Amino acid sequence: MFNRKKTSFHRIQVYIFLLSAALSSTFLFSGCSKQDDYPKTRDIDYTVVTGSEIPQELRKMIRERKENAFELSFSCEGELYIVKGYGKQLSPDFSITVNELYLSDNYIVFDTELYGPKQKSTSKAKSYPYIVVKTEYINKSIVFK
């Protein structure tokens, strides 16, 4: 004969498993949709600046922060400098690309990406990759992606 307690316990286990699977798949697939919280109003023209083109005060701020990843902005003489640093890397030859710099209704959106060396480096040199872009001064908060 069947043991009723054992059978009902087994049914509860099956229901819990099915409920867990349904909830897990719901959370998993809901994370796949991309929601654009910052719809583009217009692109912003910019110039990547290096070395002496970067204001001295901003260069000092970068040196102070370069060990760790950082994001900052700096305005000077009607121009806005936006900086994204990736912190200390254990090899040289990293590159950074600007995917987008645009204006949304309430924000400036700055999207960059760090690319590692194409081949494994034998150099022991460390690097501190960062990128500085210069654009017109716009009085809006910056969202870094």
Give the residues covered by each predicted segment.
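Bacterial N-terminal signal peptides
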Residues: 17-27
